[in-house]
Amino acid sequence: MSTPRQILAAIFDMDGLLIDSEPLWDRAELDVMASLGVDISRRNELPDTLGLRIDMVVDLWYARQPWNGPSRQEVVERVIARAISLVEETRPLLPGVREAVALCKEQGLLVGLASASPLHMLEKVLTMFDLRDSFDALASAEKLPYSKPHPQVYLDCAAKLGVDPLTCVALEDSVNGMIASKAARMRSIVVPAPEAQNDPRFVLADVKLSSLTELTAKDLLG
């Protein structure tokens, strides 16, 4: 029988897990794409973009419907700026976030954030909700060659926390994020959106919850 792993750190995703920002990213993306003359009704032609870095999403659009004018990087910056302003307007903290972070601290765990969003957005969001001091390390995939589902952002966060990835539990809402955390060899907790709860791919996770309000110490530690 294998020895249970010791969990020393919990690493959270941000978009869709801490804040209900996925609809805001969608809105920002579609607003900007429509302003470029892109036919946004063809969005269903794109693969599953949940959890992907925004430059990867912009590249997918460009491959199908190239536009004239602003560079892809400029378009990425427009989408990010729009998404941040929507987050500031709506302040969409999800239920159970403060309690989940507090539970991790009560269990003596280090707490990290690993996100595809830009570092300045991570800082802004945590500060907005008075959560910055609860996080021991932040890692962004913004400047990495590959973002989720590649594990690098999780490996970077574990390194910043000073722990082995095998001693981490990752909390995610997306399949791409779950794959990234499992590729980093972490314990995996998923909290899918209601419409994704029955996605069979989430069978790869160690624990599946319908809300962070359900999180227990046993879920974290195994």
From Swiss-Prot:
InterPro entries: Beta-PGM-like, HAD-like_sf, HAD-SF_hydro_IA, HAD_sf, PGP-like_dom2. Pfam families: Hydrolase. Changing D13A: Loss of phosphatase activity. One of its GO terms (molecular function) is metal ion binding. Its EC number is 3.1.3.68, 3.1.3.22, 3.1.3.50, 3.1.3.23. Its cofactor is Mg(2+); Mn(2+); Co(2+); Zn(2+). Belongs to the HAD-like hydrolase superfamily. CbbY/CbbZ/Gph/YieH family. This is Hexitol phosphatase B. The lineage of its organism: Bacteria, Pseudomonadati, Pseudomonadota, Gammaproteobacteria, Enterobacterales.
